[in-house]
Amino acid sequence: MTQITLLTPDDWHLHFRDGDMLKETVPATARLFQRAIVMPNLLPPVTDAKMVIEYRERILAARPEGSDFEPLMTLFLTNDTTEQDIIDAKAAGVVAAKLYPAGATTNSDAAVKALDALFPIFEKMAEVGMLLLVHGEVTESHIDIFDREALFIERNLRRIVDAFPTLKVVFEHITTKEAADFVMSASDNVAATITPQHLLLNRNDLLVGGVRPHNFCLPVLKRNIHQEALRAAIATGSSKFFLGTDSAPHEKHRKESACGCAGCYSAWSALELYAQVFDDLGIIDKLEGFASIHGPDFYGLPRNTSTVTLVKEKWTVPSEIILPNGNPIVPFFAGEEVSWKVKS
């Protein structure tokens, strides 16, 4: 197959950041994706309805002229979140709330330290129809970074899912066989997003031949048996798995430093890279489900009606992009050849 037409896809997990960065990140996503779930881990985090409304307005203001791209907003859960916060956020159009264990990722220091205290919040979310999005890692310093996702499932996620069977839960950016197996065996109210980097790469691509900071993300890349498990999961065509890039921009100097930031900025190449993976696996016919159907169906939103066409044509991801402030950012797969391209 040398050409494929899909219903316009959505990105069910990304980071736009804020300020001038929005002038880069919003158009990058809006070029191909109709909707995106926008992460709330700003400084300060987006913890109430007023902050959500204001952030959404800033995103809309950064859309390209004529764009009808729709940001889907989320609330940042803390141990100070109240049931009224959930009610107000739902009224403001929030579709999901995000559970970050404190310290798990960029700007998550204010996040959840006492999970059980949030159980009344989860109950209210189930009642009003708000999804729970989970960054599934434990964060105690003595626990090996490669084991944190699997431990989170056993310590926390299984308890949440069992306690709130009507709560829809998205296990975001899964990276392990344990996560894929958990999602497959859980109820229909549990699903997962998978990033392009976790399908394309494993920890060798981060550490062999030198540290490669632009492949560094959280959750960190795992060994190849886990990469293969994720690839096997999408090959099933299961509606439990769908596209979430976790596109996470950081300026070049913040990645290429003695203590570099975590995140892969994949918005400019994500759909094409997913197509490459699906094609390599001989399942290109399953790409539309993963990219365009499973996500809206799980969220209870209408599928898009417009389409996008990809052709099998090689192109090279730019080595860097200049941000509105004049600083460079290195996109994911920079300088690499990609075998699928969006038909202009």
Swiss-Prot record:
Recorded metabolic or biological pathway in which this protein acts: Pyrimidine metabolism; UMP biosynthesis via de novo pathway; (S)-dihydroorotate from bicarbonate: step 3/3
Entry note: cofactor: Binds 2 Zn(2+) ions per subunit.
EC number, UniProt record: 3.5.2.3
Keywords for the protein's UniProt record, in alphabetical order: Hydrolase, Metal-binding, Pyrimidine biosynthesis, Zinc
Binding annotation for substrate: H15, F16, R17, N41, H135, L218, H250, A262
Record protein name field: Dihydroorotase
GO cellular component, one term: cytosol
Catalytic reaction annotation: (S)-dihydroorotate + H2O = N-carbamoyl-L-aspartate + H(+)
InterPro entries: Amidohydro-rel, DHOdimr, Dihydroorotase_CS, Metal_Hydrolase
Active site residues of this protein: D246
Coiled coil: none
One annotated GO biological process: 'de novo' UMP biosynthetic process
Residues that, per the record, bind Zn(2+) 2: K98, H135, H173
Annotated Zn(2+) 1 binding sites: H13, H15, K98, D246
Family statement: Belongs to the metallo-dependent hydrolases superfamily. DHOase family. Class II DHOase subfamily.
Organism: Shewanella sediminis (strain HAW-EB3)
HAMAP family reported in the protein's UniProt record: PyrC_classII (MF_00219)
Function: Catalyzes the reversible cyclization of carbamoyl aspartate to dihydroorotate.
Residue positions where N6-carboxylysine is found in the record: K98
Enzyme class: hydrolase
Annotated gene: pyrC
Pfam name, any one: Amidohydro_1
Cofactor(s) demanded: Zn(2+)
Molecular functions per Gene Ontology: dihydroorotase activity; zinc ion binding
Subunit structure: Homodimer.
